Each structure stands twice: as C-alpha cells, then as structure tokens.
Amino acid sequence: MQYTTALVNTKKTALVVGGNAPACFDDKYLSDKDNLYFYLTFQNPLNPNKQISIFTPEFDVALEYNTYPDCKLLLVEHELSSQSKSDRYKHPEIDEIYSIYEMSTEKDMPEKNCAIKFGGNVMPIQWGLDNDGKVVKDGNSFIFQINEICMKDISVFMAGCIYVYGKIEGNKATNPFVAYWEYS
C-alpha cells in the first residue's frame, strides 16, 4: 500500500548530517546495548510539526545488523528541535555538514539525484536481496529512502541507502522505522 505522494512537500529542505544531535535528546538515553551516534535530521514533510532523526551504532554493529527485522539503525520522530550544544551523540567519523537537499517523489526519479525519496517503489542498490519483500510481508509499507550517494562528502554507509517503512492508513504514515540499509 502506498500513500499519496502529492502530500509530500518536495521543495528543498534543510538536512543536517553529523554534528550534534537535536537538543531534545540531551536528557534521553537511546540504547542500553549499543553506543549510538547521530547521523542526520530533517523536518518531516508528512508532518511539518515534527522532525525525523536517525542514529547509528558503531559501523561493525550496523553492518552485522543491517537487515530487517534486526536493523540497528534507530529512527526517532520528535518535536522540532534546534541543534544541541552537547556532543554526547556526535558521530566520530563525520563533521557537521549542513546542506539544502531536494526531496523527490517517484515521478521525479531517476532523473533527479535526490538525497531523500518519498513514496512510490523502493529503489534498491543491491538487486536480488528482496529486503523489501520481507518487510512488506509483515504488513509494513515503504515510506522513504535516504540516498547517501547524493550527499557530498558523506559515506558512513559506504555510499548506501537507508530504507524507512511504517504503517500506512489512508494518507497517513505512522510508526516509521529503519527496516534495513544497503551499500554500493
């Protein structure tokens, strides 16, 4: 099931990659088991009053657990928040890169090299793995993907893609989570 991509504002959006996490995480403990590092944040185009942030564990853990249902990347949807002064979740391998990226929907692809693609069909990097089929079989729907290859000077996931799924009810996407990630 797919939601109407017409609801997605595909204008350019600020995407903060690296640096300090949003301030709303200053007093939150995100994991009992893994060290988590802030990867990126952006305003949710499906709900402009919310922000989406993604955290990643150490690379070897992320690589070992990169598929559904065991993916260790953490997506948190939260209230709008400015950048923290605390470096508690700062990723040790990336400096802050603040950029303006275009979002796209299925009709724009593949002509546009957009950092974030909302709706439509999954565009896998690693053909033949059927990661999408496993997630959909459990009643989840594709919401968006983050294309790291379209982000200048960023390669935390080996120029890969992060795939986000959730529940689709009418034109609302709820309970988003990172289902898996692939690398090129």
Q: Language-model segments: what does each one mean?
A:
Residues 1-184:
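Preference for intrinsically disordered or flexible, low-complexity segments
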